[in-house]
Amino acid sequence: MRKLNIPINKIKKYLQNRNETSFAQLLLDKEKECLKTIEENQKILNDIQLVLKHLNKIKHSHLGQITLTFRKAKQFLMTPVDSNISGTEIIDVLAQHNLKVFSKEHFREKAVGWILSQNDFFQGIYGKPKAFFSTPNPLYHEQQNIVIRPEGLYATIRFQGILLEHTQELSDLFNDFLVSNRLKAVDDIYVITLKDHWLTDDIKEYISQISLRVESLDKE
């Protein structure tokens, strides 16, 4: 029984009243313990593979180039931000959002992102976030917190640094891209930091991404 890693105290207890039923129960209890360990280790393995996949995406990022791709509809766990609250209160909202994401030991698909007004962005203004978003875990996130990002064409760019320091530059770049390709923005701006303080202590080494849904002007 020790070869099955059954504790000595349980073996001693069994030997005091040994019979077929007790032996079967001893094995069933050990089986249950093994299955629980396998499940826990599988979760850890899934998290490791998710992080490695994310790191690989960062490694192969093409920076400074706007791409236009079709994306399917996607669910996001969304926490809205009141437009009238202060900067300190925004930090509190972000903390509450993070609590939702991490409360069940769920690894995020990507870092927590935020949504900015397209009107502010195209004026070169880094405004307050309208909401924070994360990829949800459908097993426990309440449905009322889930928002669908529509399918469609998305213009996306990855760049080194943080948006706060490059807002005007990126605004001009997107404006030129939309005009050149006869496109118009139809949604607000999705912002995420792919490489952050967990991977570097220099914000100039951060890798960020912004994207927005667009439509062709020729459809009108």
Each model region followed by its residue ranges:
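Short, charged amphipathic alpha-helical surface segments
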Residues: 12-67
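Mid-protein regulatory/catalytic core that forms ligand/cofactor-binding pockets
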Residues: 53-157
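Alpha-helix N-cap/loop-to-helix initiation residues
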Residues: 41, 86-87, 163-167
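C-terminal regulatory/effector modules of DNA-binding transcriptional regulators
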Residues: 112-220
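Hydrophobic alpha-helix position signal
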Residues: 1, 101-102, 178
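Non-membrane alpha-helical structural segments and their capping/turn regions in soluble enzymes
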Residues: 24, 88-91, 168
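Short, positively charged
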Residues: 1-13
